[in-house]
């Protein structure tokens, strides 16, 4: 049984809020005009050709279901932890396009089969074996990433409400199916990571967009270290927008199917009703778990990962790990250093540059750039070596033998990431399924308040600490975890104004 900080019945609250928030607003602009630009969707005929089945595709690796106004996608490879492959993409993308054109599909749910995984990533072992066949195999792998990123971009710009159940392992390709959605639900079984630097690759599937936009240096930290987050920590970090117990997901899905939006509702109103419906099923956050990426650890992450060179990050971590260091995070710093020494040096350099550049990329440009980067990695030593050592041989022949073998082998000032950010003349620029794009997520308000939100509130008004926390609890309508999240931000980033009880943001 989940023991929570606050267990309260929310039935009735959501319906009351929904009735207030869903009054028609005839001046509100629709999603397509307001955020995503002119729509240029792929034709049905072109989609059928692009995603047509190929020999070897499994017939039931994805299951689709319709219940009233809800359409669901169920990844159905539980024995493989629902690892994503081309066969699955060729089923999911055309179905999403079909539902986007349907007036009957009012909410989409994506989930994984079984209790262990939502989606543990892409089937990279198959890609490494394919690459070993030579240029034709490499081309097939590059084409796979093209299909995957087309699907990721479609999800990131989707015009129907999209809800992802991150119930179980959610890594790599599974992150691409979920992270760009307005609703991302973590459970006590969720395990999140972007493990690409472990296998000589880079955080892809739109991580170039998502990670750099996280507060402080949390995104670069997650991308470089492949750090694991579990359960409610995925929610506290802002990767999930909601935290529910896994046992409530079937009932939530049934409840979402019963929602009947009015034709005149804006997308904001539709999303608000879905948000309130999800909140009905919240039973609170575990009472005995502090925020892992918070407090001293979060301050150390921001101190160490703010640099633009890997050797400067390593030096900062060594300083934090030294005996007598004032940060009080010696154990964390030592563990982080150990993790980084095991990663592909090339992957670390590419990923750090990606984190810095990605902040200025639009969502469409992100997937086009990542496609070019993936093409370079398919031809690289480290990807094929890393996947073979870790996932195919499973360590039987020792750890991966990177080239260069270690960070120390890279000469000072050498720019080994440069080539990965140049277009490959043999790889055409990726054509996406529509021309929609944006610079910030258009509906990024359903998760917990973060540093950006708290800073904005402090700068707009005079608040005492408790009044500010109460402000967020009230404006987020009692959302579980708000008090803990805002308190952590204030502990790290705010000070009391001189001579008053009001808080102000620390000078950076």
From Swiss-Prot:
Keywords: Hydrolase, Mitochondrion. One of its GO terms (biological process) is valine catabolic process. It comes from the Eukaryota. One of its GO terms (molecular function) is 3-hydroxyisobutyryl-CoA hydrolase activity. It is found in: Mitochondrion. The keyword Nucleus does not apply. One of its GO terms (cellular component) is mitochondrion. It is an enzyme of class 3 (hydrolase). Its EC number is 3.1.2.4. Component of the mitochondrial ribosome (mitoribosome), a dedicated translation machinery responsible for the synthesis of mitochondrial genome-encoded proteins, including at least some of the essential transmembrane subunits of the mitochondrial respiratory chain. The mitoribosomes are attached to the mitochondrial inner membrane and translation products are cotranslationally integrated into the membrane. mS47 has enzymatic activity in vitro, and is able to catalyze the specific hydrolysis of 3-hydroxyisobutyryl-CoA (HIBYL-CoA). NCBIfam families: PRK05617.1 (NF004127). Component of the mitochondrial small ribosomal subunit (mt-SSU). Mature N.crassa 74S mitochondrial ribosomes consist of a small (37S) and a large (54S) subunit. The 37S small subunit contains a 16S ribosomal RNA (16S mt-rRNA) and 32 different proteins. The 54S large subunit contains a 23S rRNA (23S mt-rRNA) and 42 different proteins. mS47 forms a protuberance of the N.crassa mitoribosome and retains a solvent-exposed cavity liekly capable of accommodating a substrate, in accordance with it being an active enzyme as well as an integral constituent of the mitoribosome. This is Small ribosomal subunit protein mS47. It comes from Neurospora crassa (strain ATCC 24698 / 74-OR23-1A / CBS 708.71 / DSM 1257 / FGSC 987).
